[in-house]
Amino acid sequence: MPNVIGVQFQKAGKLEYYTPNDIQVDIDDWVVVGSKRGIEIGIVKNPLMDIAEEDVVLPLKNIIRIADDKDIDKFNCNERDAENALILCKDIVREQGLDMRLVNCEYTLDKSKVIFNFTADDRIDFRKLVKILAQHLKTRIELRQIGVRDEAKLLGGIGPCGRSLCCSTFLGDFEPVSIKMAKDQNLSLNPTKISGACGRLMCCLKYENDYYEEVRAQLPDIGEAIETPDGNGKVVALNILDISMQVKLEGHEQPLEYKLEEIETMH
């Protein structure tokens, strides 16, 4: 079980793990590391910790150093240059008539590479675009096609709830979300009601799903005949949050509500 440090390269981004290399770091320290993209600067989110080997990609790389003022200045300068590179790329994309939507642009710390993230409905032949960009920017060019959920994460925004998007605020990874989760929570299945800014099912459908599944497994099915303190009847509705059910009793016009524990005492 290796000792590692969790480093994040963007807000709410996925953690990448590095060995400390005998360097003492604290949470929120800026560090210089070698990533799969090149030399980058990131922020420490998890200090020294033990982690199972199956949860990391081996072999682990070392932290190079704690970022100094020169590194921070270079990082900030790179961000300004990335804004200009993004404008340039958008102009070239427009001139070339490419059907792609540029999302953002990032330089590695040593400027050995510039990465453009984009979305597109189909595969794009961007070989000519790469050639033109390389002539202008004098560095290696990487064009990376991402999905709409990643686009929302990078750009940020406001969700239907009126709060900042979860994916751009605190969600490191996207977990699978299904329409069944909305059904289990008795939510409207209208796509406009359960879709996020990205157009996909809202990530928050997952948050309470485990609770709903746990409680639902304890409650009887709708239509099931059960025995209550007031006689026999059929379940006509369930209230997951209240852990209760409405039961239509024989000889009663209106259903009565019972807590789960009231029914359990009958058995």
Please place each PLM-identified region on the residue numbering.
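A short, compositionally biased
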Residues: 1-3, 25-27, 219-222, 239-243
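Acidic-enriched and Gly/Ser
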Residues: 1-191, 267
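A short macromolecule-binding patch
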Residues: 16-17, 252-264
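Short coil-to-beta-strand transition motifs
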Residues: 35-40, 224-232
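Short, conserved beta-turn/loop elements at beta-strand boundaries and strand-helix junctions
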Residues: 48-52, 238-243
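Conserved glycine-centered short motifs in functionally critical loops
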Residues: 161-228, 236
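Secretory/periplasmic and organellar redox-cofactor proteins
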Residues: 237-239, 262-267
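Basic/aromatic-rich interaction segments and small domains that mediate binding to polyanionic partners
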Residues: 239-257
